[in-house]
């Protein structure tokens, strides 16, 4: 049985299928956390929000209901037929510093209770740990993962192989490479919740990109990511699965999730949402409710908005408009924008993943300059045949060999109807950002330098002049009246 299949791609995001013993999971998706002792919302109820699978803590089950779990199985105690992923107690290890169980015991326990996706007892090294500590923890984690692989030989359960390494890029990349050698079914990126809590999205993006560099195809799970404002960026960077108890934890503090951030119920006069909760109640009604009822409804909203964002992301992947969606979402917070801009340092990775042909290019701001389509265009035009004298113009109403467009730069006349430059929607040159004009001007000068034997006569409107003052010697600059 093929356990993993990629159906659609855009940027580094994908729509995939993962086959488990209890059915198929289509990604990207979220696995809501279910507390086996006190289920805030029951596992089966999660289906109405869009859940295809859930995650629970096998260590808690082992400590509090071991015999019942061995008798009924994890699906029996959660009363669901959905796929169930079980964590191993690593969270407790991170919070309390110790757990009273060995790796082999918890892996075997997860297998015996019928977990669909098993997680070994990895060591979640926190951000900013010194290199020696992170490396030592990683060695132990890798040994435990190898042990788990041996223990699960011949089993139908899927194995998750967590990738650790703290905030050290080389360790994360090394860990991902070693995890790939071990051979898991899913690769969770661990110990990143402190980065998300502190809004350290630049560091988060680097961690994801380093892991994706060593795992170019495999399914990646971003452990503990449960805020909808992060999903689009994380998917575009290469993540497929998310899990979180955020829907419940935020609700307990009267915090209301949106794709642009978190709102306090006390500050809301209107709900910016039309989910069943928000359609049938207003903020004042919720504030007057008993705490338990209010928490439940806010948690339901938090789940609805989270799964709605997943559907929005999937549709964007289908339409090849994921870049446009991400460029909107990252403006929710300056630190998210800084995180997204880390893709500039991983050009080759992004170019390999992103589809070469799409229906259109919609410019949303200067971050559109970083898309692979722009870089590919600038490379491609260097191979276009040019006459001895090349006429370049910013006026599309007159004849020219090459037209100069913001963002893309030189566009040969024969490419005016082709993707990307010919299918691009870009603001007029007098209102577009200066960076878009500068990038286009640099692309033109790069083309001129690559053809020193050709003569370029360049006719541009005034807005371009300051960016083209230093044309190469084979260029003649003229201003259009």
UniProtKB/Swiss-Prot annotation:
The highest taxon in the source lineage is Archaea
Which InterPro entries does this entry report, sorted A to Z?
A: ArchSynthase1/Queuine_TRR, TGT-like_sf, TgtA, tRNA_ribo_trans-like
Q: Which residues form the active site?
A: 87 (nucleophile)
Q: In which pathway does it act?
A: tRNA modification; archaeosine-tRNA biosynthesis
One example of a Gene Ontology biological process annotation: tRNA wobble guanine modification
Signal peptide from the UniProt entry: none
According to the record, cofactor stoichiometry and binding are noted as: Binds 1 zinc ion per subunit.
Q: Which residues bind substrate?
A: 122, 191
* Reactions mediated catalytically: guanosine(15) in tRNA + 7-cyano-7-deazaguanine = 7-cyano-7-carbaguanosine(15) in tRNA + guanine
Keywords of the record: Glycosyltransferase, Metal-binding, Transferase, tRNA processing, Zinc
Q: Name one GO molecular function term.
A: pentosyltransferase activity
A cellular component annotation (GO) from this entry: cytoplasm
Q: Does the keyword Metal-binding apply?
A: yes
Membrane-crossing residue ranges in chain numbering:
none
Query: Where is Zn(2+) bound in this sequence?
Result: 273, 275, 278
Its EC number is 2.4.2.48
Record Gene3D superfamilies: Queuine tRNA-ribosyltransferase-like
Group of enzyme by EC? transferase
Cofactor(s) required for function per UniProt? Zn(2+)
What NCBIfam families does the database record attribute to this sequence?
Answer: arcsn_tRNA_tgt (TIGR00432), tgt_general (TIGR00449)
Give the protein's function: Exchanges the guanine residue with 7-cyano-7-deazaguanine (preQ0) at position 15 in the dihydrouridine loop (D-loop) of archaeal tRNAs.
Q: Which family does it belong to?
A: Belongs to the archaeosine tRNA-ribosyltransferase family.
Under what name is this protein listed? tRNA-guanine(15) transglycosylase
Which organism is this protein's natural source? Archaeoglobus fulgidus (strain ATCC 49558 / DSM 4304 / JCM 9628 / NBRC 100126 / VC-16)
* Gene that encodes the chain: tgtA
């Amino acid at each position: 049985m093929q356990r993993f299949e990629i159906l659609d791609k855009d940027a580094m995001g994908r729509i995939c299928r993962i086959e488990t013993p209890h059915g198929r999971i289509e990604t990207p998706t979220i696995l809501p956390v279910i507390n086996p002792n006190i289920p805030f919302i029951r596992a089966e109820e999660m289906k109405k929000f869009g859940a295809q699978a859930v995650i629970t803590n096998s260590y808690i089950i082992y400590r509090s209901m071991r015999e019942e779990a061995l008798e009924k199985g994890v699906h029996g105690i959660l009363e669901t037929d959905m796929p169930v992923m079980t964590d191993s107690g690593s969270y407790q290890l991170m919070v309390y510093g110790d757990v009273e169980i060995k790796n082999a015991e918890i892996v075997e326990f997860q297998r015996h209770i019928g977990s669909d996706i098993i997680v070994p007892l990895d060591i979640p090294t926190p951000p900013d740990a010194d290199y020696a500590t992170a490396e030592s923890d990683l060695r132990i984690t890798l040994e435990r993962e190898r042990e788990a692989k041996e223990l699960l030989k011949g089993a139908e359960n899927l194995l998750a192989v967590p990738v650790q390494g703290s905030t050290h890029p080389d360790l994360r990349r090394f860990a991902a490479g070693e995890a790939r050698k071990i051979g898991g079914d899913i690769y969770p990126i661990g110990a990143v919740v402190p980065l998300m809590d502190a809004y350290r999205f630049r560091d988060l993006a680097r961690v994801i990109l380093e892991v994706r560099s060593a795992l170019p195809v495999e399914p990646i799970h971003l452990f503990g990511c449960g805020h909808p404002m992060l999903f689009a960026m994380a998917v575009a960077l290469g993540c497929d699965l998310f899990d979180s108890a955020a829907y419940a934890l935020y609700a307990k503090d009267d915090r209301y999730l949106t794709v642009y951030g978190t709102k306090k119920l006390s500050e809301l006069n209107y709900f910016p949402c039309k989910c069943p909760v928000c359609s049938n109640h207003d903020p004042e009604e919720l504030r007057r409710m008993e705490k338990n009822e209010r928490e439940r409804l806010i948690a339901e909203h938090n789940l609805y908005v989270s799964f709605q964002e997943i559907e929005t992301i999937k549709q964007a992947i289908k339409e090849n408009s994921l870049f446009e969606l991400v460029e909107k979402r990252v403006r929710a917070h300056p630190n998210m924008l800084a995180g997204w801009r880390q893709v500039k340092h991983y050009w080759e990775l992004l170019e390999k993943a992103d589809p070469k042909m799409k229906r259109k290019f919609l410019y949303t701001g200067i971050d559109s300059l970083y898309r692979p389509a722009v870089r590919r265009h600038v490379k491609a035009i260097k191979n276009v045949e040019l006459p001895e004298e090349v006429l370049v113009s910013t006026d599309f109403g007159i004849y020219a060999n090459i037209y100069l467009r913001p963002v893309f730069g030189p566009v040969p006349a024969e490419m005016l109807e082709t993707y990307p430059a010919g299918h691009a929607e870009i603001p007029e040159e007098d209102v577009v950002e200066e960076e878009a004009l500068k990038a286009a001007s640099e692309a033109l000068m790069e083309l001129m330098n690559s053809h020193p034997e050709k003569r370029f006569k360049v006719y541009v409107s005034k807005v371009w002049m300051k960016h083209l003052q230093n044309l190469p010697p084979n260029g003649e600059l003229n201003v259009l009246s």
